[in-house]
UniProtKB/Swiss-Prot annotation:
One of its GO terms (biological process) is phenylalanyl-tRNA aminoacylation. Binds 2 magnesium ions per tetramer. This is Phenylalanine--tRNA ligase alpha subunit. L-phenylalanine binds at residues 339, 382-384, 422, 448. The gene is pheS. PROSITE patterns: AA_TRNA_LIGASE_II (PS50862). Its main location: cytoplasm. Coiled coil: none annotated. It comes from Halobacterium salinarum (strain ATCC 700922 / JCM 11081 / NRC-1) (Halobacterium halobium). HAMAP family: Phe_tRNA_synth_alpha2. It comes from the Archaea. SUPFAM superfamilies: Class II aaRS and biotin synthetases. GO terms for cellular component: cytoplasm. Tetramer of two alpha and two beta subunits. It is found in: Cytoplasm.
Length: 502
């Protein structure tokens, strides 16, 4: 029997009663482990050896995991500080508890997001309450960190998965192959096996000399182990944003852009948002301290917007009948929605005067001081869009949504009437989650009111919307927690292995 030299070496080194690992055979034969692995699999196909595989899993603490094992998990530290502050009797101001817990930077977000998840208490409107019955001494994640620090193993796979999702541990799997000589292999060895040289690569020299016709080429082993590479790739959220852009451009829209930091005048006042609206207080927005206000606003536009707030629009208009303060409108903040871009464009400040028909969109970030949970982050992508034309109706708006979402394979949409200060009629959009079957809110929309359009000198109807890109991605991929795709708790494994769907 003739076999390649490497396979003969494996047969000679293998044993019938003592399984030899690939690494041991490589050391005995002076061949690389990957060469021996390929030879062993080829011999197994011939029935001359048996190859067994065992997988070992190793769980190791990361630097952050070591730190938490020593100092305590951020949510546990937050809970203990909350108890010290009396939060088990009545809610206390969240900032003071965070300071008392010694948390800063990313640890704050980590503590807040895990605090409620573990049942340590609740967070509402900047106030923190603690559950007196919670038991941080038996926190399974803290116990697992301590166990790993002692060099022992953790048997609870769910806890290990949770720690891995928080980047507190690394989980590595290693496949070990062992080779055992079969009776058929022994028979062939006793009968005599002749070693033949094989060529692994067709070279220009072999072609030029013609020797390629007389040599035997080695078979490629596509089942051999290969290194696991994780090259950089476009983030799934950015992929979704780019696809949304392509879809809307294909529907005839033009892209718009504008400042992330803007005056409240454009963020709220131009949208007929009253200055005493709850969403305009310091709890719900990120205000700038330096500079705190914009220097100049267009005088004529300010006058028209103020009149709309005080008196409404048209002969039968009726405003808010409340004070309107230009200094308040000059305050600078991170935009809480990208509708500020719409206001700037409709007013002709970001582009030339817009005339009907016109379609504009943006896929940009907005910033809100929300409570972190499975569907809310402090910053998120908003799909802003609007259409300026004559005689627009809610049916036009619904039809636009059905066409847009159908491009992503989403057809089960539901609409619910709602109230917005700047649109009438208004409605929210809901889509059905592919995994849970639940309806989740994916956007808000409506027809702009005259009180908004008249001060901007817009002639025509405008239908507009703000859609959540992250929630569109939820419907596309089936993940359930928005923190899995970005933020300090993102699932790196999900990001690395997510399919590129286009």
């Amino acid at each position: 029997m003739q076999l390649p030299t490497q396979q003969v070496a494996v047969l000679d080194a293998a044993s019938t009663d003592d399984p030899q690992r690939i690494e041991a055979l490589a050391a005995d034969t002076d061949y690389p482990p990957e060469t021996i692995a390929g030879a062993a699999l080829a011999l197994e196909a011939e029935g001359l050896v048996a190859v067994t595989e065992t997988t070992t899993t190793t769980v190791s603490l990361t630097d952050e995991g070591h730190a938490y094992a020593t100092d305590g998990l951020p949510e546990v530290r937050l809970y203990r500080a909350a108890l010290d502050a009396g939060a088990d009797d009545a809610p206390v101001e969240m900032g003071s508890v965070i300071g008392a817990a010694g948390l800063d930077g990313p640890q704050v977000d980590i503590a807040l997001s895990n605090y409620a998840r573990k049942g340590y208490g609740t967070i509402d409107s900047g106030a923190l309450a603690a559950d007196p019955d919670a038991d941080p001494e038996n926190d399974p994640e803290a116990d697992a960190l301590a166990t790993l620090t002692d060099g022992d193993s953790v048997d609870d796979d769910a806890v290990v998965d949770q720690l891995a999702s928080r980047d507190l541990v690394t989980v590595s799997e290693r496949t070990v192959r062992s080779v055992t000589l079969t009776e058929a292999g022994v028979t062939e060895l006793m009968a005599g096996v002749e070693a033949t040289d094989e060529v692994g690569e067709l070279t220009p020299e072999l072609l030029a000399s013609g020797e390629w016709a007389d040599v035997e080429f080695a078979d490629y082993n596509v089942a051999a182990d290969a290194a696991d590479h994780t090259p950089g790739k476009t983030h799934v959220l950015r992929q979704a944003a780019e696809r949304v852009t392509d879809v809307l451009v294909g529907m005839g829209f033009q892209e718009m852009a504008g400042p992330h930091v803007d005056a409240d005048f454009y963020i709220n006042d131009c949208l007929f948002m009253p200055q005493d609206h709850p969403a305009r207080n310091h709890w719900d927005r990120f205000a700038l301290s330096n500079p705190a206000r914009i220097d100049e606003l267009p005088d004529a536009l300010v006058e028209r917007v103020e009149r709309a707030h005080r008196e409404g629009a048209g002969d039968d208009g009726d405003g808010y009948h409340s004070p309107w303060d230009e200094d308040f409108a000059r305050a600078l903040a991170l935009r809480g929605h990208t509708t500020s871009l719409t206001a700037r464009h409709l007013a002709g400040l970001a582009d030339a005067d817009v005339e009907a028909p016109a379609r504009y969109f943006s896929v940009e970030k907005a910033y809100r001081n929300d409570t972190l949970d499975a569907t809310h982050l402090l910053e998120f992508f908003q799909i802003e869009g609007w259409v300026l034309a004559d005689d627009l109706s809610v049916r036009d708006l619904m039809g636009t949504f059905r066409e847009f979402y159908s491009q992503f394979g989403i057809h089960d949409l539901q609409f619910k009437p709602t109230y917005n200060p700047y649109t009438e009629p208004s409605f929210e959009l809901f889509g059905r989650h592919p995994e849970t079957g639940e309806l989740i809110e994916i956007g808000n929309s409506g027809i702009f009111r005259p009180e908004m359009l008249d001060p901007l000198d817009v002639d025509g109807d405008v239908m507009a919307w703000g859609l959540a890109l992250e929630r569109l991605l939820m419907l596309m991929t089936g993940f359930e927690d928005i923190r899995d795709v970005h933020g300090t708790l993102c699932d790196v494994g999900f990001l690395r292995n997510a399919e590129v769907v286009y």
